[in-house]
């Protein structure tokens, strides 16, 4: 059996939907771990920059949009993932289609934007 481990992040401004997201994830994934993460306000923009691999200044749109407070990381396992092409922020890419589609759904639930992050593939 082929399985993959992925991460789902629900940023501070999406936390009002974290319980619904956890409930829904159980339909397609095994939840391995749920963690509440707190980054110091002083280092938040540096941590966010390292995470996304691009320099994000303090007070960036991303920071304001997602929040600088506590957030949740959810580690999941999916057995027998299915890869399909989807339009991503980097263009058309082959991604874990179930997880990618869930991310799009959760982003709608949280009011649009990027208050939910997931890995899209093993790359």
Where are these regions (language model features)?
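Non-catalytic terminal and connector segments of soluble metabolic enzymes
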Residues: 1-123
